[in-house]
Amino acid sequence: MLLEQGWLVGARRVPSPHYDCRPDDETPTLLVVHNISLPPGEFGGPWIDALFTGTIDPQAHPFFAEIAHLRVSAHCLIRRDGEIVQYVPFDKRAWHAGVSQYQGRERCNDFSIGIELEGTDTLAYTDAQYQQLAAVTRALIDCYPDIAKNMTGHCDIAPDRKTDPGPAFDWARFRVLVSKETT
């Protein structure tokens, strides 16, 4: 998997307006794994793209009225079938972490990359998702080596607010896949 100017080659691009520049001299050193499903527990629709591009219709589902005002994004989404959608270039600051702290350092958006998995805290993620997440992570480590020792869940950087990627995410499996040499 290759990166060109912050974008994954071959990923579907859906540029989000919800990002800005990282602080001067800041590069990504942390990977944050999230999950998302819109409406909650449903997969495959257009709603994640709509949320991250600020175009979600608050009347399309009762839950959307609660989130339509949010200005959020992630760098990437990995759908259940393994499709990768990229919203923000990796060298820019996506708005995925919110109020957060990692190893005593606040404002995780400044120094992290956020990847969403289409899913829920309690439903097993798919083989395709693990394979793609590992491939993306290896590509990121090639560009940002510190990520290799700094991979965590949203629940770990915002434990009072967030639970994702939840107990369904198999961290050991993910780490084994990341550690495998690329072919």
UniProtKB/Swiss-Prot annotation:
GO cellular component: cytoplasm
Any one Pfam family match given in the protein's UniProt record, by short name: Amidase_2
Protein name: 1,6-anhydro-N-acetylmuramyl-L-alanine amidase AmpD
Main location: cytoplasm
Cofactor comment: Zn(2+) is required for amidase activity.
GO biological process, one term: peptidoglycan catabolic process
Cofactor(s) required, per the database record: Zn(2+)
Catalytic-site annotation from UniProt: 116
Reaction catalysed by this enzyme: Hydrolyzes the link between N-acetylmuramoyl residues and L-amino acid residues in certain cell-wall glycopeptides
Enzyme Commission numbers on file: 3.5.1.28
Family: Belongs to the N-acetylmuramoyl-L-alanine amidase 2 family.
Site (Transition state stabilizer): 162
Upregulating conditions: Inactivation of AmpD results in AmpR-dependent hyperinduction and AmpD affects beta-lactam susceptibility in the absence of cloned C.freundii amp genes suggesting a linkage between AmpD and peptidoglycan synthesis.
Binding-site residues for Zn(2+), renumbered to this chain: 34, 154, 164
An MF annotation (GO) of this entry: metal ion binding
Domain N-acetylmuramoyl-L-alanine amidase residue range list: 30-167
PANTHER family (UniProt xref): 1,6-ANHYDRO-N-ACETYLMURAMYL-L-ALANINE AMIDASE AMPD, N-ACETYLMURAMOYL-L-ALANINE AMIDASE AMID
Coiled coil residues, start to end: none
Localization: Cytoplasm
Function: Involved in cell wall peptidoglycan recycling. Specifically cleaves the amide bond between the lactyl group of N-acetylmuramic acid and the alpha-amino group of the L-alanine in degradation products containing an anhydro N-acetylmuramyl moiety. Is also involved in beta-lactamase induction.
Keyword annotations: Cell wall biogenesis/degradation, Cytoplasm, Hydrolase, Metal-binding, Zinc
